[in-house]
Amino acid sequence: METVVDHHVIEVDEFDALFIEVKTEAAPVESVVSVAPIPARFPAKLHARKIAAELNASDGLVFLPGEPSRSYEDSDMGPAFRQRRYFYYLSGANFADCAVTYELASDRLILWVPYVEPRQVLWFGSTPGISECLKQFDVDDVRYTTQLNKFLYRHLTPGSTLYVIHADQVPLHGDFLQSAAEVRIDVTSLQPAMDQARVVKTDYEVAMIRKAAAVSALAHRRVAEKLLRLENESEIEAVYQAWCTTSGAREQAYAIIAGSGKNASTLHYDANNEPLEGREVVVFDAGCEWHCYASDITRTLPISGKFSAEAKAVYDVVAKMQDECISFIRPGTLFFDLHIHASRVAQQGLLKLGVLKGDPAEVWDAGTVAAFFPHGLGHHVGLEVHDVSGRERLLLLNNVMGAQGGRVGKREVVTPEMLGAMVQASAPGAAAAAAPPPYKGRQYLRKNMIVTVEPGIYFCREYIEGYFLSNPRHARFINKTVLERYYRVGGVRIEDDILVTDDGYENLSTGAPKGEELLRVINGKA
């Protein structure tokens, strides 16, 4: 159980104080995860009404196509099927070539499914029929997609509004384009409305994520139990994947990360093919899906069964970062501030270890701690592992890698400049920080949000030398001699999925051991 902190102001060290914005004084609650029975029907109609409330429109037609059947270019083979998440949110149907419509005025939700001919069953099997879909999904009607165009002709009359996520999803074909010339096509309102609806989970969604986290946590435990007998990163991945698959969770929410040694310093390392021998720790980041809902858990394991002095010191700092931040989770907490708190704890720890040096206030003002804690503290979890955040940002950060055309990961980069801007925006009396469109500002936590808390400290030689040791502003605060001892550790990250409850939080991933329990499991003493 993490320490409960009930103060608005927490003294971090002798040079500053952290202001945590909280709108309630209730104490957080952590409970042991128990997986309740999975609800029988997907609450599509409840989701539709949440979307309608966010659209704030009394009329119009929402149209969402599902993922079509696909083949690779010049091939008769195709990728593994992955349903479009916005479509799934409004339907619950996890098979190809479907669509869903929602009539705002009549509150009528219709799922459109493909008709499966007998010869298709021979080759590919069948998909749920109309009667089965009505049992599985809370929709008003289920019809075949062969009837969809006729439905659209009848409902898209001059002056009506069609809501779609993307312009290329407008269901206009042939001469229908001319007849729909007076239909208003809205491609800007639906996605923000759906994002806002998705950010606070329904009870069904919480149950799905709870189940995904429970399966993933037990798979993490299985890896820890077998660790001393494993020789390669690939074996860690295999043990984990096998447990998930046999537990009914074949799909992973993201590429499994099993980075040992130097690879532990790469945030999205996923080659998972190097030997473990001679290395100190492995950062193991993996979370399965359950009915399309994600989980996201990270543990850092000592490969020999015992942490080295350097690895233990770093692990303790990261554990402190996580424990203290989780203890603040409750409705009304400004997540923005938790990242700043984690950064302060990281700096304090690195100064104590001697990796950082100098006047603490000057080190903080420079933002040099971002060399070692270079990503956001966490993100929403839902139908995407890095789920939508609604009209407000959890951390108010641009996706810098994506903006520059690079590979996009599930963590947001935090530079010294970004950290400084966050600190300035969080100062008492400061106005709400500006956010990039279409977001409005900083996000306070609400009941039934699910967020990760995933602090980490990394020693990536290329990153530190390329951007910090080469810059006099930061180099003067880094002790290169001490730092050299820590490169061998690679990195440490600890991550859990946290549900915001009425008056606190519930850690959904406690089944994955960490800390002293992790050491006992690895060494067969649990």
UniProtKB/Swiss-Prot annotation:
Disulfide bonds: none
Gene3D superfamilies: Creatinase/methionine aminopeptidase superfamily, Creatinase/prolidase N-terminal domain
One Pfam entry name: AMP_N
Residues spanning the signal sequence: none
Cofactor: Mn(2+)
Cofactor note: Binds 2 manganese ions per subunit.
Enzyme class: hydrolase
Record-stated family: Belongs to the peptidase M24B family.
Function: Catalyzes the removal of a penultimate prolyl residue from the N-termini of peptides.
Name of the featured protein: Probable Xaa-Pro aminopeptidase GLRG_02280
Species per Swiss-Prot/TrEMBL record: Colletotrichum graminicola (strain M1.001 / M2 / FGSC 10212) (Maize anthracnose fungus)
Organism placement in taxonomy: Eukaryota, Fungi, Dikarya, Ascomycota, Pezizomycotina
